[in-house]
Amino acid sequence: MKFLVNVALVFYGRVHFLHLCVHFLHLWAPEPEPAPEAEAEADAEADPEAGIGAVLKVLTTGLPALISWIKRKRQQG
Protein backbone atom coordinates (compact mmCIF):
# COMPACT_ATOMS: atom_id res chain seq x y z
CA MET A 1 0.00 0.00 0.00
CA LYS A 2 2.84 2.38 0.83
CA PHE A 3 4.30 1.69 -2.62
CA LEU A 4 1.03 2.70 -4.33
CA VAL A 5 0.88 5.92 -2.31
CA ASN A 6 4.46 6.75 -3.33
CA VAL A 7 3.69 6.02 -6.98
CA ALA A 8 0.60 8.23 -6.79
CA LEU A 9 2.57 11.06 -5.19
CA VAL A 10 5.33 10.82 -7.81
CA PHE A 11 2.75 10.78 -10.61
CA TYR A 12 0.94 13.78 -9.08
CA GLY A 13 4.22 15.63 -8.71
CA ARG A 14 5.18 15.04 -12.33
CA VAL A 15 1.78 16.09 -13.61
CA HIS A 16 1.91 19.21 -11.45
CA PHE A 17 5.42 20.01 -12.69
CA LEU A 18 4.38 19.59 -16.34
CA HIS A 19 1.36 21.78 -15.73
CA LEU A 20 3.59 24.53 -14.34
CA CYS A 21 5.98 24.20 -17.30
CA VAL A 22 3.13 24.59 -19.77
CA HIS A 23 1.78 27.53 -17.78
CA PHE A 24 5.12 29.36 -17.85
CA LEU A 25 5.62 28.63 -21.54
CA HIS A 26 2.20 30.09 -22.21
CA LEU A 27 3.11 33.23 -20.24
CA TRP A 28 6.37 33.73 -22.14
CA ALA A 29 4.95 33.03 -25.59
CA PRO A 30 4.46 36.11 -27.74
CA GLU A 31 0.86 37.10 -28.31
CA PRO A 32 -0.40 36.64 -31.87
CA GLU A 33 -1.11 39.72 -33.95
CA PRO A 34 -4.85 40.50 -34.02
CA ALA A 35 -6.64 40.38 -37.34
CA PRO A 36 -7.60 43.75 -38.88
CA GLU A 37 -11.31 42.91 -38.54
CA ALA A 38 -10.84 42.18 -34.86
CA GLU A 39 -9.06 45.51 -34.38
CA ALA A 40 -11.90 47.39 -36.06
CA GLU A 41 -14.47 45.64 -33.89
CA ALA A 42 -12.44 46.30 -30.77
CA ASP A 43 -12.14 49.99 -31.69
CA ALA A 44 -15.88 50.24 -32.24
CA GLU A 45 -16.60 48.54 -28.92
CA ALA A 46 -14.02 50.62 -27.08
CA ASP A 47 -15.56 53.93 -28.21
CA PRO A 48 -19.22 54.06 -27.17
CA GLU A 49 -19.39 57.66 -28.41
CA ALA A 50 -19.05 56.41 -31.98
CA GLY A 51 -22.30 54.44 -31.67
CA ILE A 52 -24.10 57.37 -30.09
CA GLY A 53 -22.74 59.67 -32.78
CA ALA A 54 -24.11 57.41 -35.49
CA VAL A 55 -27.54 57.39 -33.82
CA LEU A 56 -27.50 61.17 -33.47
CA LYS A 57 -26.50 61.56 -37.11
CA VAL A 58 -29.42 59.39 -38.23
CA LEU A 59 -31.81 61.32 -35.99
CA THR A 60 -30.64 64.74 -37.13
CA THR A 61 -30.67 63.88 -40.83
CA GLY A 62 -33.41 61.28 -41.01
CA LEU A 63 -35.98 62.69 -38.61
CA PRO A 64 -36.59 65.96 -40.50
CA ALA A 65 -36.86 63.99 -43.73
CA LEU A 66 -39.38 61.65 -42.12
CA ILE A 67 -41.43 64.56 -40.79
CA SER A 68 -41.52 66.25 -44.19
CA TRP A 69 -42.52 62.94 -45.84
CA ILE A 70 -45.40 62.53 -43.33
CA LYS A 71 -46.55 66.13 -44.00
CA ARG A 72 -46.54 65.50 -47.77
CA LYS A 73 -48.54 62.29 -47.36
CA ARG A 74 -51.11 64.11 -45.19
CA GLN A 75 -51.45 66.90 -47.76
CA GLN A 76 -51.90 64.39 -50.59
CA GLY A 77 -54.79 62.81 -48.76
UniProtKB/Swiss-Prot annotation:
Q: Please state the protein's primary subcellular location.
A: secreted
Keyword field: Allergen, Amidation, Antimicrobial, Cytolysis, Formylation, Hemolysis, Ion transport, Membrane, Porin, Secreted, Signal, Target cell membrane, Target membrane, Toxin, Transmembrane, Transport
Biological process GO annotation list? killing of cells of another organism; monoatomic ion transport
Signal peptide annotation: 1-30
Q: Which residues form the propeptide?
A: 31-50
Could you give a GO molecular-function term held by this entry?
protein kinase inhibitor activity
Q: Where is this site: Important for the flexibility at the center of the helix, flexibility that is important for the stability of the voltage-gated pore?
A: 64
On tissue specificity, the annotation reads: Expressed by the venom gland.
What is this protein identified as? Melittin
Q: Which organism is it from?
A: Apis cerana
Q: Which gene encodes it?
A: MELT
